[in-house]
Amino acid sequence: MKTNKENEPQLLISFRDIKEISDQNFKYFDICDLKDPEKGSIGAWEEKNILNVVKRCKQRVRVSATIGDIFSVEGIIKKLQQFDNFGLDYIKFGINTKSVLELKDLINRIGKFIFRTKLVLVVFVDKNSTLKIIEENLEIFYQNNIRFLILDTYQKNNQNLISFYNPLKIKDFINKCSIKKINVGLAGRLQPNHITKLKLLNPYVIGFRSAICSDQNRKFLSEQKLIFLSNQFFSNKSNAIESAGA
């Protein structure tokens, strides 16, 4: 159950449809993330269901939603403007490019609009060329009102975030982003055994989906696994540090 202290990482749980969300479970996480893996790596929910969840739980947890696997500049901006009217706390969008010019064009164009909702760029660590140009151009995000990046995996197979990006590299990335006043989240088939190590890196948020599912395809949520994960995540931080050093 949540016992978060200020400046500690937040727990994000991804839900694939409205049937998975129970009012009794809000106490186990900080951010309710609406993402349908059946529709893509960052597949989007239907608008009516997003609005329903926002109405139900906005006063109890924060709500984020993904816009879908849309990677064209025009498509992303259109979806960001649409989702900005939903009352969300965060809107997550991805980018899939090897071009610095395309990255800068997208981010600069986003910066011309005023969004009420916090924008979160999903950075796919298994797409090395995209990750590299983002890391080399961090200054453009803060300048254009994007203060949140989340490291994730695009391909949802047996590999996870740490398979592609070890904790030392993650810490270095978080430090670079901190200098630019950008918050970093971590996700990508993470499991309970990753919690201690990743919390010590002090990300803004750590996200889970696979870890709370009863099947390998991430289709069926297990409430028992959710409770176990929450207990692991919100256990005393000093105990986590002690365990890491043991």
Feature locations, PLM:
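C-terminal alpha-helical cap/extension of soluble enzyme domains
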Residues: 182-246
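Active-site-adjacent beta->alpha loops and helix N-cap segments on the catalytic face
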Residues: 39-56, 72-76, 97-114, 130-133, ...
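N-terminal entry module detector
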Residues: 1-41
